[in-house]
Amino acid sequence: MNKKLLALTLSGALAASMLAGCGGSSNGGDTSTSTDTKADTTEASGAEGSVYYLNFKPEQDQQWQDLAKAYTEETGVPVTVVTAASGNYETTLMSEMGKSGAPTLFQVNGPVGLANWKDYCYDLAGSDIYGQLTSDNYALKEDDTVYGIAYVIESYGLIVNKTLLEKAGYTIDDIQSFADLKKVAEDITARSSELGFAAFTSAGMDGSSDWRFKTHLANLPIYFEYQTDGISSTDAIKGTYLDNYRDMWDLYINNSTCDPKELSAKTGDDSRNEFLAGDAVFFQNGSWEYANLTGDGGYTDDDLAMIPIYFGVGDEANQGLCTGTENYWCV
């Protein structure tokens, strides 16, 4: 779980490196769906260029404003940070790219997002930040052209309340496969009145929650099909492992804190709050949830673990967490 803290630290370090490599105009302009704060500037002798960063994460706006101010104070290079409203990044980016002072630093979410902006991207192959990567897996590239650099690596799986799991008579060592997970979850459901908790938090289909299943869970059948077929891209999947996807979804909704009929209205906050209240053992989410689950009145590190989303495919005992990024910086 402490990987979240490491990711944030790396994010800050990468930010300083990336800002140092940017030039051009910073006149971003106002939009109705963004926060635009220009850092106070102190021009240093010999300072050239400026930076306009279109930020994706509203919850990190203040940190970026602080970093921009500190960078300007140190270098004299003016930095503008505009933060798009939640869920409006792509539309804001389209609007800003049409202006004379387009962003010098922006974000794409991977190959799909890159398709729209490839022609705008500076090749980072010879940059200092690319040279600092420990693996090309952290770069968004085609052939020898580097279009983007991952700036945070995160993991997701099943977050486990170990205390509740042990109260049900199990430990995480008892769960090494989908069959094991199914056995434990269904046993907890059968004894839920006695135990006082369910197996899984609600798998809400509200927009604040459904991405966990429409994107994160849906990655698994695609990943395993790619692995089986030895490919890295395809125009259409064959659906080899869609039955596994359905089986996992059925396990979630039939062993949950709520009736499946209620899922359309359940939110991400509902799922998190159920886990915090000790209403369920398992919570599908990722390392970014660490701060929400710990701290004052929350869990300790000893209370929590994260296990893979076992899918009934391959060598499950050696399966790891789903790890990667959908956050790439482009210049």
Can you annotate each of these PLM segments?
Residues A185-E186, I231-A265:
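Glycine-centered hinge/linker elements that transmit conformational signals in sensory
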Residues S17-G21:
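C-terminal motif of bacterial Sec signal peptides marking the signal peptidase cleavage site
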Residues T83-T92, F178-D180, E262-A277:
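Short helix-initiation/N-cap motifs at beta->coil->alpha
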